[in-house]
UniProtKB/Swiss-Prot annotation:
Annotated site, Required for activity, chain positions: S375
Locations listed in the record: Cell inner membrane
Family: Belongs to the ATPase alpha/beta chains family.
EC number from the UniProt entry: 7.1.2.2
Single GO cellular component term: plasma membrane
Key words of the record: ATP synthesis, ATP-binding, Cell inner membrane, Cell membrane, CF(1), Hydrogen ion transport, Ion transport, Membrane, Nucleotide-binding, Translocase, Transport
Protein name (database record): ATP synthase subunit alpha
InterPro entries per UniProt: ATP_synth_asu-like_sf (IPR023366), ATP_synth_asu_C (IPR000793), ATP_synth_asu_C_sf (IPR038376), ATP_synth_F1_a_nt-bd_dom (IPR033732), ATP_synth_F1_asu (IPR005294), ATPase_a/bsu_AS (IPR020003), ATPase_F1/V1/A1_a/bsu_N (IPR004100), ATPase_F1/V1/A1_a/bsu_N_sf (IPR036121)
Complexes and interactors: F-type ATPases have 2 components, CF(1) - the catalytic core - and CF(0) - the membrane proton channel. CF(1) has five subunits: alpha(3), beta(3), gamma(1), delta(1), epsilon(1). CF(0) has three main subunits: a(1), b(2) and c(9-12). The alpha and beta chains form an alternating ring which encloses part of the gamma chain. CF(1) is attached to CF(0) by a central stalk formed by the gamma and epsilon chains, while a peripheral stalk is formed by the delta and b chains.
Gene name, Swiss-Prot/TrEMBL: atpA
Length: 515
């Protein structure tokens, strides 16, 4: 006999089965890749994408949304794009790019995404921060009044740099720009200033050499190296300065001092130009996009000296009574000394001064090849140590007068005594400003050298023996007046007792004749 089912039983059975089915609904914003070329992906069908948002692609690859158009999104791939295909699924993440930050990064070499590339294992950093951030406002800033010693007599005496300043280092290729910046990093050993060195578009061998030199000089322990080498994509070179800045800001926000070197921003601008042209953005002067000024201004404005209130607010009261600072040394490479090109003029107008390095001076053996006439520090004077400020006033004047007189002396057959003395003093000052690479000088030694040349103690020393005399003088003071040297290095003060000690020590050394 056939079993008959009531319609109500059938209905109950269907309801039970429906209730037993477990469905989970997940809202996703997905699109599909329509083209991939030269590190740029075009994605159709993505809605509600934010400018600068991370877009997830297959194989754990991410892209950065830069062009938001009516029907599609133009994004730049961060990393390898060879495995991407037309039709691949792209998803929004709702996040912007973040990199690891913290003291765990000190002594490490990372790429633009904060991933370690030095073979020393994982970083162990527990915190991350977005690469793009609004610069501190006017209310949160403090004036620059503490020095950053570079260890170079010519810079610390004539073009002083303060904590929180942006000082441009500009010059042609092979004029010693990187050498100056690396020596400044080495000189921060023992000062408590943390350093970040960002290598943009450089040869990997050059970066490896810099890391080795930092390690040899004991400076890698307080330094983070961010490397986006020439072999990496334009996207990595474009974001690397922002990533490095974020790593430096970590220390500034917690009431510490940091120094960041961007080497160099010319290559970042070229990488950004490449990305912009591939995204079909309209080109402007020198084919750069219209927002290339903003590219650098939003980066360099993040370097600042911030107040105690800012640090206290940022740390929720964990750190009180301390100011923080991020000092920036951006480097720009010029072509045949043309500082009126687009990118150099932009960065000159953004920064608080510039150090011009000249090919002619470099080839003449004057290294660092600083042109004191057109180099300037707009805010660093307030940050100079007392002793250097007191003694260095005559240096710039001596050099300026020497250059003027040297030009006239070429046409004069005989010179009066005063002119001849000025020329000889200028020659000695120029010679004394020379300094070897990887040999930054302490405040006391700088002060001693400047005092000796200003007071005429070097007038009877042959020019070709000046540097040997200087080396011997420093060694003499270290042996006979070590306590005074330590006091000057720690306080930077100047008084009559120090002057008397300088006079006596220099005269004693000259009588020994051991130079």
């Amino acid at each position: 006999m056939a079993t008959t089912l009531n319609p109500s039983e059938i209905s109950d059975l269907i309801k039970t089965r429906i209730e037993a089915v477990k469905l989970s609904a997940e809202s996703r914003n997905e699109g599909s890749v329509t083209s991939v070329s030269d590190g740029i992906v075009r994605i159709f069908g993505l809605a509600d994408v934010m400018q600068g948002e991370m877009i997830e692609l297959p194989n754990n690859t991410f892209a950065l949304a830069l062009n938001l158009e009516r029907d599609s999104v133009g994004a730049v791939v961060l990393g390898d794009y060879e495995n991407l295909r037309e039709g691949d699924v792209a998803k929004t993440t709702g996040r912007i790019l973040e990199v690891p930050v913290g003291p765990e990064l000190l002594g490490r070499v990372v790429n633009a995404l904060g991933e370690p590339i030095d073979g020393k294992g994982p970083l162990g950093a527990t915190q991350t921060a977005p690469v793009e951030r609004v610069a501190p406002g006017v209310i949160w800033r403090k004036s620059v009044d503490q020095p950053v010693q570079t260890g170079y007599k010519s810079v610390d005496a004539m073009i002083p740099i303060g904590r929180g300043q942006r000082e441009l280092v500009i010059g042609d290729r092979q004029t010693g720009k990187t050498a100056l910046a690396i020596d400044a990093v080495i000189n921060q050993k023992g000062t408590g200033i943390k350093c970040v060195y960002v290598a943009i578009g450089q040869k990997a061998s050059t970066v490896a050499n810099i890391v080795r030199k930092l390690e040899e000089n004991g400076a890698l322990a307080h330094t983070v190296v961010v490397a986006a080498t020439a072999s990496e994509s334009a996207a990595m070179q474009y974001i690397s300065p922002y990533a490095g800045c974020t790593m430096g800001e970590y220390f500034m926000d917690r009431g510490e001092d940091a120094l960041i070197v961007y080497d160099d921003l010319s290559k970042q601008a070229v990488a950004y130009r490449q990305i912009s042209l591939l995204l079909k953005r309209p080109p402007g002067r020198e084919a750069y996009p219209g927002d290339v000024f903003y590219l650098h201004s939003r980066l360099l404005e993040r370097a600042a000296r911030v107040s105690e209130d800012y640090v206290e607010k940022f740390t929720n009261g964990a750190v009180t009574g301390k100011t923080g600072s991020l000092t920036a040394l951006p480097i720009i490479e010029t072509q045949a000394g043309d500082v009126s090109a687009f990118v150099p003029t932009n960065v000159i107008s953004i920064t608080d001064g510039q150090i011009f390095l000249e090919t002619d001076l470099f080839n003449a053996g004057i290294r660092p090849a600083v042109n004191a006439g057109i180099s300037v520090s707009r805010v660093g004077g307030a940050a100079q140590t007392k002793i250097i400020k007191k003694l260095s006033g005559g240096i710039r004047i001596s050099l300026a007068q020497y250059r003027e007189l040297a030009a006239f002396a070429q046409f004069a057959s005989d010179l009066d005594e005063a002119t001849r003395k000025q020329l000889e003093r200028g020659q000695r000052v120029t010679e004394l400003m020379k300094q070897k690479q990887y040999a930054p000088m302490s405040i006391a030694n700088q002060a001693l050298s400047i005092y000796a040349v200003n007071e005429g103690y070097l007038d009877d020393v042959p020019v070709n023996k000046l540097l040997a005399f200087e080396e011997g003088l420093h060694a003499h003071f270290a042996n006979t007046q070590g306590e005074l040297v330590s006091k000057i290095n720690s306080t930077g003060g100047w008084d009559n007792d120090i002057e008397a000690s300088f006079k006596k020590g220099i005269q004693e050394f000259k009588t020994t004749g051991t130079w």
